[in-house]
């Protein structure tokens, strides 16, 4: 191309063509479009044809390609026309040579599809990609090509699984108009995909569209049983309540009037700790309903924040604490213990709950875990367990809390000292004898005997026997001390009588002499305890 033509092509498009330029000169300059007239550039996106017709450059490119006018196509591409329109025009005119010329510049023919409305050309373009047929419909859904969908409607009516896949695709793209078209034009009555996608993407508009379809499409066609099936069988309220979507819940309640709806909402709210939902509904609940909601939260092991929210709307009382205790013990749910531990009457509340928990807990490990979590004194749990004869728990806590023999013995003896429950004290002292006595040395055994004498332990005389074998002289002194201790601390004569008979038996065995008894135990000699 000579330089004058290049110069004209560069400068003339934005200027008015000289009047003396005839068609021959314009043809030489490459600015004449056969069957259309002169052509010049007008701005960035348009061309001026025959000095008076203004059309978009891409539209001109499509027409030129359909006519297989290589020169004008080349000119318009130089004027920043979109190559995709050249391919579209070539497809419209079946200009395969032109397609082959430019086809290698197209990376993905799917990118051309948004610019095509004609379903036949849409199909032709897609075939160039050598892609499977279903992909055509996916692309039609993606780009909202209703004419293409209508063109292939017969195919969709005979392939409902494919139709459902298209609905799912449209839902994922939030393409509401396509969803409406698919439901209105195809025999699709299962709208589960719409609701599931709406919930998954938290798309309230799509969720509403599902209900609109049910009542505007299904019900008028006398498919009311499907309406009931969808509302109850899909469990939409369960799903949106589990997600904590309050707007979705309120939308669902417009259509679903089941009597159990409130229970479903509250159960899901406490299970998944959706405090926003609880805050919305609590003002509408009765005191008894809030109580039941709290018990459900304990059962579901809800977070402390959820429990605290519910407790803040209840008046704490001994009666309520006892109910709470039962749920704590039954379901091994201990979060509420930490909350009550911060209340004004925490000692009263904790005693009630811990007693129930220790009594009814299925596994000892839950009690131990609770003790560690809330920094509860192990002796406190041990005394509770001893009162109700859960000695395996006492043993487990002792081993968990104190790692050596001496520490365990020390704390168990202290628990006996501070415990008032008689049977519980005896059980602890029996535990000491059964599990720790055989690790003791001489001095420890004599010390234990005095300890047992103070607390009237059932195993006292077993320890006396071992003391006598270890050291008879020290034993006589121990016996005298213990006799005085028992006599001083006894609240009735039973224990004194037992000791006196025991001393009498020792005389018969020859352990004590008559002189020693007259000297140290004159009251026994004067009575009928001597054989």
Curated annotation (Swiss-Prot):
A family per Pfam: DUF249
InterPro entries in the cross-refs: MGF_505
Family: Belongs to the asfivirus MGF 505 family.
The protein's role, per its UniProt record: Plays a role in virus cell tropism, and may be required for efficient virus replication in macrophages.
Protein name, per record: Protein MGF 505-1R
């Amino acid at each position: 191309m000579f330089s004058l033509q290049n110069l004209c092509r560069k400068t003339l498009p934005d200027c008015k063509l000289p009047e003396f330029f005839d068609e021959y000169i314009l043809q030489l300059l490459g600015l004449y479009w056969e069957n259309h007239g002169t052509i010049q550039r007008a701005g960035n996106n348009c061309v001026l044809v025959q000095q008076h017709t203004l059309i978009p450059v891409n539209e001109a490119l499509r027409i030129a390609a359909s006519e297989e006018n290589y020169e004008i196509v080349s000119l318009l591409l130089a004027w920043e026309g979109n190559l995709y329109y050249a391919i579209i025009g070539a497809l419209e005119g079946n200009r395969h040579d032109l397609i082959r010329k430019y086809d290698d510049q197209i990376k993905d023919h799917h990118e051309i599809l948004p610019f095509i409305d004609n379903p036949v050309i849409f199909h032709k373009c897609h075939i160039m990609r050598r892609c499977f047929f279903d992909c055509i419909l996916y692309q039609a859904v993606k780009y909202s090509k209703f004419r293409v969908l209508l063109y292939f409607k017969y195919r969709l009516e005979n392939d409902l699984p494919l139709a459902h896949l298209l609905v799912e695709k449209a839902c994922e793209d939030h393409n509401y108009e396509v969803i409406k078209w698919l439901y209105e034009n195809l025999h699709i009555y299962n709208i589960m995909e719409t609701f599931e996608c709406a919930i998954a993407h938290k798309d309230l508009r799509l969720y509403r569209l599902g209900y609109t379809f049910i009542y505007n499409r299904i019900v008028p066609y006398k498919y009311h049983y499907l309406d009931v099936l969808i509302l109850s069988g899909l469990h939409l309220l369960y799903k949106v309540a589990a997600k904590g979507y309050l707007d979705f819940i309120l939308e669902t309640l417009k259509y679903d009037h089941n009597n159990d709806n409130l229970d479903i909402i509250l159960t899901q709210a406490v299970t998944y700790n959706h405090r926003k939902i609880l805050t919305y509904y609590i003002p509408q609940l009765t005191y008894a309903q809030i109580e039941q909601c709290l018990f459900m939260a304990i059962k579901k092991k809800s977070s402390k924040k959820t429990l605290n929210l519910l407790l803040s709307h209840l008046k704490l009382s001994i009666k309520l604490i006892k109910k709470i205790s039962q749920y704590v013990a039954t379901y091994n749910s201990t979060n509420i213990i930490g909350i009550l531990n911060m209340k004004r009457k925490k000692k009263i509340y904790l005693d009630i709950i811990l007693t129930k928990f220790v009594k009814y807990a299925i596994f000892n490990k839950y009690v131990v875990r609770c003790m560690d979590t809330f920094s509860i004194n192990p002796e406190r749990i041990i005394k509770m367990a001893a009162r109700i004869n859960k000695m395996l728990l006492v043993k487990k806590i002792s081993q968990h809390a104190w790692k050596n023999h001496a520490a365990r013995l020390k704390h168990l003896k202290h628990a006996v000292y501070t415990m008032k429950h008689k049977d519980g004290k005896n059980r602890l002292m029996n535990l000491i004898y059964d599990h720790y006595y055989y690790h003791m040395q001489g001095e420890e055994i004599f010390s234990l005997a005095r300890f047992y004498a103070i607390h009237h332990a059932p195993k006292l005389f077993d320890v006396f026997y071992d003391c006598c074998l270890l050291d008879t002289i020290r034993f006589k002194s121990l016996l005298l001390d213990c006799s005085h201790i028992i006599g001083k601390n006894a609240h009735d004569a039973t224990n004194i009588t037992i000791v006196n008979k025991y001393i009498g038996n020792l005389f018969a065995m020859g352990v004590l002499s008559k002189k020693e008894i007259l000297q140290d135990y004159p009251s026994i000699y004067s009575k009928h305890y001597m054989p």
